[in-house]
Amino acid sequence: MGKPGRSSIPSVGVHHQGPMSFPDFSASDAQIQWQRFCDLLWYHEDLGIWLDISRMHVNPSHLEQLQPGFDKAFAAMAELEAGAIANPDEQRQVGHYWLRTPQLAPNEAVRDQIATEIDQIDQFGRDVISGVIKAPGGQPFTDVLWIGIGGSGLGPLLMIRALQGHGSGLPFHFFDNVDPNGMSAVLAELDDRLATTLVVTVSKSGGTPEPHLGMEQARHRVESRGGRWADQAVAITMVDSKLDREAQQDGWLKSFSMFDWVGGRTSITSAVGLLPGALIGADIRDFLAGAAQMDDATRLADLRRNPAALMAASWFVAGDGKGRRDMVVLPYRDRLEVFSRYLQQLVMESLGKRLDRDGNEVNQGIAVYGNKGSTDQHAYVQQLRDGVDNFFATFIEVLEDVSDIPVIKDECPGDFLDGFLQGTRSALTEGGRQSLSISMRRFDARRLGALIALFERAVGFYGDLVNINAYHQPGVEAGKKAAAAILDLQSRVEAVLKDGAPRTVSEIRQAVGDGSDEAIFWIMRHLAGNDRGYRAEGDWANPASIRFSCS
């Protein structure tokens, strides 16, 4: 089995007489299961990663039917990597693959910018950890407060949970929501160490409300304690965005670039994921190298020998091409506990679309959930085995255990973990449930990069198979607009109530001139529930009776 690359193809199994020759699925015949396992197994020798789709109900006839669709998907992916407008709704290129192989970028300026950014991030991380770059008071930085939403929060959280070793780099704290209680808890935990905390704000446009609100709360707390905000603030944003201009004008400690052609859910190999990796002492170049290796393996225009294509085909067949089965992610390692949440965004934001590229209403998508094994075996696996058959499982295992957890009385925790995975996989198969498995010899930055790249490419292929734009998010934008409308309505409601006169929600709506009674009730219930200067009189069980006023 040779090392994979452009001239050496990853091993994909043996015993097949033709390109689509393997036995049809059988839940009861162990020899057929073994034959399918041998025939369908994909293996990357250098990465030490296996993909097994043999327990998915994929038969040769399915792959033959999907071949024309994959021919188009392979061509579309090649065009995307070459710089085509792959996101036509927003007239944008899609370039996250360039981030780990800069020579693919369409021009020298972009290639140089990517390479320079990686060098700067790597050096900045080293300088912060070593104390060369110091906090405003002259002490070394002790912590990082990371402010980001969506992929700008999930990607960094995955990097930290998956790669940070004990005592390695700086401890991380997150503002990844606008929950006041959550912010308060983080700030209370930092307490006096806030003065030696590096505060990183991530916002591509610089105008997203959630990171802006988190940033202002952090700035207020720093400055209220006499700190110098600019000397401990870092921005990750697009050049000349609102946030970038503020950082440049106020002299922030550092700014790193986000690119118009990288979406949040695929930004983990940009500064969004590389900076947290650098700040915990992870090998970010190895992380990028792993992603690049998997990218190379998944460029192969051969359905049977491309792991991302095999995954996408399995998803398609399992859900009849309409997302009729959920994806349950079961990583049997604590370090990958966040991975199911990461995949939730990557898969659901990419594939959950109302319209296809031709404007037809299709309501596509694959729901994703999961936590970790073997914890999940004592939670929802009961339903997976005996309940509604509306899912397929994705098992993820790491073979190599740590050396400091010994075998005691002939019992090894790693053996039990492996046994639990195999047992659950077998029990699901016996119950007619589908699953695929990803196995890794070891887990480190390189394998994490490869794992992420595998799913990124599979999502792209699946999007092409079902003819949807996997690179925009109109539903998210619709939610942002609706939220902005509610906040605008709230400001007008508060203006009406300034005269102090008690009003029902219906009377408030009439005075405002638009909005709905229900929306106004929700607004007023929130305001009255906090110390914001509003009173509510009436029966809460009868919302129409309550009269709200400004005290």
From Swiss-Prot:
UniProt similarity note: Belongs to the GPI family.
Cellular localisation: Cytoplasm
Keyword Cell wall biogenesis/degradation: no
Species of provenance: Parasynechococcus marenigrum (strain WH8102)
Reactions catalysed, as given in the entry: alpha-D-glucose 6-phosphate = beta-D-fructose 6-phosphate
Organism domain of life: Bacteria
One MF annotation (Gene Ontology) recorded for this entry: carbohydrate derivative binding
Function: Catalyzes the reversible isomerization of glucose-6-phosphate to fructose-6-phosphate.
Residues passing through the membrane, by range: none
EC number(s) per entry: 5.3.1.9
Class of this enzyme: isomerase
Main location: cytoplasm
Keywords for this protein: Cytoplasm, Gluconeogenesis, Glycolysis, Isomerase
CDD domains in the record: SIS_PGI_1 (cd05015), SIS_PGI_2 (cd05016)
Protein's name in the database: Glucose-6-phosphate isomerase
Location of the active site: 349, 378, 480
GO cellular component terms listed in the entry, alphabetical order: cytosol
Pathway the protein contributes to: Carbohydrate biosynthesis; gluconeogenesis; Carbohydrate degradation; glycolysis; D-glyceraldehyde 3-phosphate and glycerone phosphate from D-glucose: step 2/4
InterPro entries: G6P_Isomerase, Phosphoglucose_isomerase_CS, SIS_dom_sf, SIS_PGI_1, SIS_PGI_2
